[in-house]
Curated annotation (Swiss-Prot):
Disulfide bonds: none annotated. This is Glycosyltransferase-like At3g57200. One of its GO terms (cellular component) is plasma membrane. Keywords: Cell cycle, Cell division, Cell membrane, Cell wall, Cell wall biogenesis/degradation, Cytoplasm, Developmental protein, Differentiation, Glycoprotein, Glycosyltransferase, Growth regulation, Membrane, Secreted, Signal, Transferase. Belongs to the glycosyltransferase 25 family. It is found in: Secreted, Cell wall; Cytoplasm; Cell membrane. PANTHER family: GLYCOSYLTRANSFERASE FAMILY 92 PROTEIN, GLYCOSYLTRANSFERASE-LIKE KOBITO 1. The lineage of its organism: Eukaryota, Viridiplantae, Streptophyta, Embryophyta, Tracheophyta.
């Protein structure tokens, strides 16, 4: 028995060790196979050959994802671009792009609140208007009222603009001018000091009349906010986590009628800028967003011998809540016929003004104005000192002299000065608009809009053609007519003079206080 007992007891460890060795083998097998499985899975994920993904057929790119171009292909792309000697401002980037956003319409519907619209008066081409429109669509603008003339009203440009969801194109026809000639504005005093003058004054009156019409359109469309912007300006909705203008205006108190966006001015660092929205990242801050001591303490350095702190205006732009009796108060502000609007000024958000960002802007502005290049005559045509000086230079100097003047007065080439003013906070880097517009371009949004528009029949080609027949003289009639048709029951406060473009505070402001 003892032997049997000892024999049986000695066999127990052998029986118990069998399951232990089996589990160890399984664990070893698992540890061995798991890395191999993960490696195989990773290989399958990054494998570029063999399988044909039907989704990739939607893309016209040979490579569907960024990073899938070989070194040899990159060299050939660079060679082809350099050989052509031109840059495709509207088309696809020469680098690979993510293909699934092509035909991205940004067709916002009425359920998105608040509903925001922008109105502008423009003669710019597609290379400027398309990035401008789609950038503002990205940040939450749903509707655009484009009062077009010149290049913007040409058939090749207008037919593209008409196909964009949310864009309303208004041509400067004789019918429009006759309608605006009957505006109540001509019987009021707040804009009267700008009547009967050429160039910038004429444009200022025209913008105000267009803004008045845009208010009516915005009311009919159920818009909640309206903003007047030029096509060389972008809203910068800083201060919101989502970089959203809709979020920004949605948080405004219900008793606020007007929201003022201080403007920042572009500070270009090269004289060969082609596409400002994608190439300019440095801006000069507005007085309203700086400490007083910082502003005046660095005023001379920031001005660099120019007439004012900003090259052009410094009083920003404004968004108005769409409501009864709203009226424009010049291109920069809004007013109300029945009350003084409750205004707030934003502490972080701004309007980015791309001021003379291209050397060619000197001559293009000159060509739009028939003013004589004398110090006396330019005061009739331009409101701001820098515009006057730029017009005289563009009208009298040689190309070499113009370029030298442009480099001295507009381009920031002094690296030490830039670094100093960046540290002081006078200058700042803003990359969001650049990134958004570059991504839209690389996604093929702009090129697909142009291609789609030219494949479809034009909606209003006859209107565009008739617009091109309107002479400059008939257009100038807008600033010279005054039709007295209304007896207005308005108080004196509602007749406050229109707010023109104004320069920022100068050093004389501190001397006056002393």
């Amino acid at each position: 028995m003892a032997g049997l007992y000892s024999s049986s007891s000695s066999s127990k460890p052998t029986l118990s060790s069998s399951p232990s060795s089996s589990s160890s083998s399984r664990l070893f097998l698992l540890v061995t196979l798991l890395p191999l499985s993960l490696a195989c899975f990773a290989f399958v994920l990054q494998w570029r050959g063999g399988l044909d993904d039907p989704v990739t057929h939607w893309s016209i790119d040979h490579h569907e994802f960024p990073g899938m171009v070989t070194t040899q292909e990159k060299r050939s792309l660079r060679r082809s671009v350099s050989d052509s000697g031109c840059v495709d401002l509207l088309g696809q980037s020469r680098s690979p792009s993510f293909p699934y956003f092509r035909n991205w319409k940004f067709d916002y519907h009425s359920d998105l609140k608040p509903r925001i619209c922008i109105t502008t008066s423009t003669s710019a081409g597609l290379e400027q208007t398309l990035p401008w429109i789609y950038f503002h669509k990205v940040i939450g603008v749903s509707t655009f009222y484009l009062f077009v003339e010149g290049k913007a009203a040409s058939p090749n440009v207008s037919r593209v603009l008409e196909t964009i969801p949310g864009v309303k194109v208004i041509y400067r026809t004789k019918e429009l001018e006759e309608k605006q000639a009957k505006s109540r504005i001509w019987n009021e005093t707040w804009l009267s000091s700008f009547f009967y003058k050429p160039c910038n004054y004429e444009l200022f009156v025209k913008q105000s009349l267009n803004m008045e019409m845009a208010i009516t359109m915005a009311q009919d469309a159920g818009m909640e906010w309206i903003i007047h912007l030029d096509t060389d300006e972008l809203i910068h909705p800083s201060g919101t986590h989502e970089y959203s203008l809709r979020k920004l205006l949605g948080n405004i108190s219900a008793d606020v009628d007007v929201v003022i966006f201080p403007n920042y001015e572009s500070s270009v660092e090269r004289d060969d800028i082609r596409e400002p929205f994608s190439e300019v990242s440095m801006f000069k801050k507005n007085f309203d967003h700086l400490l007083r001591d910082v502003y005046f303490g660095n005023y001379k350095d920031a001005t660099r011998g120019n007439p004012n702190y900003f090259l052009t205006y410094g009083n920003g732009k404004a968004a108005a809540r769409v409501q009864d009796h709203l009226r424009p108060n010049g291109a920069h502000r809004w007013h109300n016929y029945r009350k003084s609007p409750n205004e707030v000024k934003l502490e972080e958000a701004a309007v980015l003004h791309y001021t003379y960002p291209r050397f060619s802007d000197l001559t293009s502005r000159r060509d739009r104005c028939g003013c004589k290049p004398t110090k006396v005559d330019v005061k009739r045509c331009f409101m701001l000192e820098f515009d006057r000086a730029a017009f005289i230079i563009a009208s009298t100097a040689s190309s070499e002299e113009m370029l030298q003047w442009y480099r001295e007065h507009v381009v920031w080439t002094d690296e030490k000065l830039k670094l100093k003013l960046l540290r002081k906070g006078i200058l700042t880097r803003i990359y969001a608009p650049m990134v958004i517009i570059q991504e839209l371009r690389e996604a093929g949004v702009f090129s697909s809009v142009v291609i789609a528009a030219h494949k479809s029949p034009s909606k209003n080609s006859s209107t565009a053609d008739s617009t091109s027949g309107i002479t400059r003289e008939s257009s100038q009639e807008t600033g010279k007519r005054r039709v007295l048709e209304f007896h207005l029951d308005v108080d004196g406060e509602s007749q406050a003079s229109a707010v023109p473009p104004q320069s920022p505070p100068g050093l004389e402001a501190t001397q006056m206080e002393l």
